[in-house]
């Protein structure tokens, strides 16, 4: 199936939402005015003048280029007109282009490293250290917690305001040895395990991690809503933010929300109005309808080299959803006052890192120009 031929689910949802709105107004006249006000508010957001919208920088997340030296990567990004970078500092992204220890040990090296990007008009916008600092394996938990702490210290030194990572996932109890991702509270023991995870592991860890970040001038910890971690959707993100504080926000990677049937624009509006979006990965998802119909969307256990059994897979921007959908998404980020960057992440199993990133940049730049009325 050609990914571009996948049906546009948003138009169908828009139709159903409009139909439901009208039906509700007829069935409950006393609520019609409130529903009309909601519709008017959404319409007003869609009619914001381009002149008032921020030109959000378009950047790249560096793990897509593991075989390039830092200088080679900078040369390539400069040739492509990349405006910002998200740099891995350890954990799952590795630290291929960032010698963390050297930069922490020598302030002059840190200044020179950052200047290397800035001399090519590339902003070092974000440091990323995705890991599992609440792992039931104490060695993994301490390793990833230390990676987070060192990333905070490096961000402080470099003047970077945003750190990206995962919430992590504990085991199901104090004697467990492997993580246990729980999304359903029944049978009863699963609900008990979930409560234990949040009360005993997740909230205590992130309270102290946020305190450490705050003490070093870092006030934006962008957690990626990702399967297999306790923060995997907007609701769990907001739960942790409420428990820990406003240092916790979202790395809004919509590729993980599309398969959960989230409406991307609604997610951006909801989180954006709370000032809870700190970072945005730009990555797409395509669905294989026959497999969705047969197996549903919780169909991840397939060989990434054989997509014949997959219900969905990551794609470069524009290869899962249309450019018009991405226009709505990018405009929504602008309308809610998002202050970060658009960071292209390539995990496309079909396109190489270089091809996937370059094609995503092409789509995003053209869509941004169309929104802002620029060239």
Please report, for each region that a protein language model flagged, where it lies by residue:
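Twin-arginine (Tat) signal peptide motif
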Residues: 8-16, 29
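Short, acidic/polar
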Residues: 67-77, 143-152, 262-270, 326-328
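Glycine-rich, proline-tolerant flexible connector loops at the mouths of alpha/beta enzymes
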Residues: 88-112
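Acidic/histidine-rich catalytic cores of soluble enzymes
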Residues: 55, 84, 127, 186-320
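N-terminal secretory signal peptides
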Residues: 1-11, 38
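Catalytic domains of carbohydrate-active enzymes, especially glycoside hydrolases
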Residues: 73-91
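Conserved, mostly hydrophobic/aromatic
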Residues: 60, 77, 85, 117, ...
């Amino acid at each position: 199936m050609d990914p571009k031929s996948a049906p546009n689910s948003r138009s169908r949802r828009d139709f159903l939402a409009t139909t439901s709105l009208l039906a509700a107004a007829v069935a409950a006249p006393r609520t019609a005015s409130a529903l009309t006000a909601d519709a008017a508010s959404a319409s007003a957001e869609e009619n914001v003048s381009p002149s008032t919208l921020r030109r959000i920088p378009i950047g790249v997340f560096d793990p897509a280029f593991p075989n390039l030296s830092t200088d080679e990567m900078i040369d390539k990004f400069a040739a492509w007109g990349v405006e910002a970078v998200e740099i891995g500092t350890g954990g799952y992204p590795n630290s291929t282009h960032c010698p963390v220890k050297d930069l922490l040990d020598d302030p002059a090296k840190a200044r020179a490293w950052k200047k290397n990007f800035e001399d090519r008009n590339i902003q070092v916008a974000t440091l990323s250290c995705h890991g599992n600092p609440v792992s039931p394996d104490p060695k993994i938990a301490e390793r990833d917690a230390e990676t987070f702490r060192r990333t905070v210290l490096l961000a402080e030194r470099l003047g970077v305001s945003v750190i990206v990572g995962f919430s992590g996932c504990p085991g199901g109890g104090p004697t467990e040895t492997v993580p246990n991702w729980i999304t359903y509270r029944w049978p009863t023991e699963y609900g008990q395990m979930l409560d234990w995870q949040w009360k005993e592991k997740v909230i205590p860890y992130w309270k102290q991690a946020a305190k450490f970040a705050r003490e070093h001038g870092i006030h934006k910890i962008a957690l990626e809503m990702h399967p297999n971690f306790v923060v995997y959707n907007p609701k769990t993100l907001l739960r942790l933010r409420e428990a820990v504080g406003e240092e916790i926000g979202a790395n809004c990677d919509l590729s993980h929300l599309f398969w959960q049937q989230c409406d991307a624009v609604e997610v951006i509006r909801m989180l954006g109005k709370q000032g809870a979006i700190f970072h945005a990965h730009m990555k797409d998802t395509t669905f294989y309808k026959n497999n969705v119909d047969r197996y549903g969307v919780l169909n991840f256990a397939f060989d990434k080299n054989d997509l014949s059994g997959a219900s969905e897979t990551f794609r470069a921007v524009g290869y899962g959803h249309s450019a018009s959908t991405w226009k709505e998404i990018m405009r929504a980020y602008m309308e809610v006052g998002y202050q970060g960057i658009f960071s292209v992440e390539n995990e496309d199993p079909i396109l190489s890192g270089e091809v996937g990133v370059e094609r995503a940049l092409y789509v995003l730049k053209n869509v941004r120009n169309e929104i802002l009325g620029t060239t």
